[in-house]
Amino acid sequence: KREETGIYEMKNEERRIMQEIQFIVPAALHDEMLRLRNEKQMDFLESLTGMDWGVADEKDAPEKLRGLGVVYHLESTVTGERIALKTAVTDRERPEIPSVSDIWKIADFYEREVFDYYGIVFVGHPDMRRLYLRNDWVGYPMRKDNDPEKDNPLCMTNEETFDTTQEIELNPDGTIKNREMKLFGEEEYVVNIGPQHPATHGVMRFRVSLEGEIIRKIDANCGYIHRGIEKMNESLTYPQTLALTDRLDYLGAHQNRHALCMCIEKAMGIEVSDRVKYIRTIMDELQRIDSHLLFYSALAMDLGALTAFFYGFRDREKILDIFEETCGGRLIMNYNTIGGVQADLHPNFVKRVKEFIPYMRGIIHEYHDIFTGNIIAQSRMKGVGVLSREDAISFGCTGGTGRASGWACDVRKRIPYGVYDKVDFQEIVYTEGDCFARYLVRMDEIMESLKIIEQLIDNIPEGPYQEKMKPIIRVPEGSYYAAVEGSRGEFGVFLESQGDKMPYRLHYRATGLPLVAAIDTICRGAKIADLIAIGGTLDYVVPD
């Protein structure tokens, strides 16, 4: 239905594909967003995507959108309603759009990402810095007219650390004022954790301001492993883009590729066979167990429980062996394809999965005996790193982190895909919001995933494992969105096509970025040792 504002409001059944996103002028953007947040209860900023629609041309049709802009996806956790809108400015020298970081906390990082890639300045943003690229990077690489290699030769020197940022203010006369702000005061004691620290689980750098052992502020730098995948996608055909999704959250390879394939299939009107839906759902749940077992092992190691570390890795190997037999890979599977899967199930697949289910159920109590009930583990996690439900929603912390804070945000329940509407399973929700609750959610989800697989494994229907596709795949012109419940939360895909064999824009709603964005809020007032437990239970994956 349409509101007076001209914004397209999606019904629930349109959750995974939308082709109409209405425009709103930048001057009215902030007031409209505030109205949607307060009156329509749009409290979840699902995605914020930067766009370059090009320079206006006299040959353009009157309705052709041009300029630099942003696409917003909003959802109400109260009513389930969803809204999508976009805005744009034609001034490429000084593109300015009102910030919504005062409405949704995750917009702080999302808008910094757009500024980093497109040079769009968000008026009212308190921390207008680059998010991923070096501070001395020249230009904005996601602009269609930018040549990154020309202005940025290979740099082999260390990046200088800056302690200042820009707060963008709007003056009463409508002009813009850049106010320089200090990230840390001269008297603050700041230490580096990372980028090469085992507890950051990858090349993540936290600059931590301490007062004794108490954390006062954290500045996260998550660009050390930035690879420009979204830029690369613009020069790849649709089948070629699939190879990169497995390499984002490498513990959610099946789920990531499932989302991208589903987005392209829905856009093209392709209906995959029931056999494919069953296979994809089973693989997604095996992937979830695989991820949660590694979560258990890594968290146990972080907190000093070396023996528990080996339990998770021992049993995870059984899943990787199953993956390898059917997919040919253990970590990077490359299994889902547009219209189906790469190959049919191995003859041993059903047998090995059916052997794994009772085995895992029978041994999970050992995990709890050795770690969950351990008084040291409980003292390190209970009451530590509390994230409120309101903050979880405002930061967009989906998955186990959101559900540990009382937010029922499971995509499999909200808008079922695959064959999740045919199985009975419980959405695990805790309300404590601390490290221990985040840990228990994932341990309980292992059992629920086993339950889902058990209901499907003996009922996989016959049928083709791959629909017949044209040699060159072209997606109809339009904008599309699809999402799945990844191991760490909602993994979303926003696709804008102009009818070519390559995507005009392909943006991923990462599961990990909101988790990293929330670390500063969660850790304030905690001890530095608590940062290790908090980071471990948030379960972010850095390349994501």
Residue ranges and their predicted role:
Residues 1-214, 291, 373-379, 383-384, ...:
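Terminal low-complexity/charged segments
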Residues 135, 168-201, 209-544:
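Active-site bordering "gate/hinge" segments
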